[in-house]
Amino acid sequence: MQRVERAVRIVAVQAALLTTALHLLWAVPRLSPSMLTESVADSRPFLFVPAAVLLIAVAVAVFRGYRYRRLSTLGGGTLAALLVGYPLYHGESAADALASEPLALAAVVVEAVGIVAFAGLYYFHHPDRLGLAAGTNKNADND
């Protein structure tokens, strides 16, 4: 069971970091100081950078071995928001946009894998499954 949990944790960390890299590769060249003073036609670069920072923080925490369900929910939810945001932004032409942008296609695939991995971590990080709930019973220490 620990090997499976470790493998799922590695996949989740890699998916979070790869998603971060793909989104920053797209967003950083599109950021400019003039975007702060003028009207913005595309706000995605401003959204991708904080999402990338959040995914890096989640990946570091998962890599360090923190076993919190909230952490798994945060990682999976961030990836799900990025995944759902793509068709919402492009609308009916999402399939055409996905076919024409290989970076976006890679990001969508990695985000889907990451969502599944973080859902697996959510399952594995149940307090009873790791024996963490046993320490909350104060009567067991008095025997």
Where would I find each of the regions flagged by the language model?
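Membrane-interface extramembranous regions
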Residues: 1-143
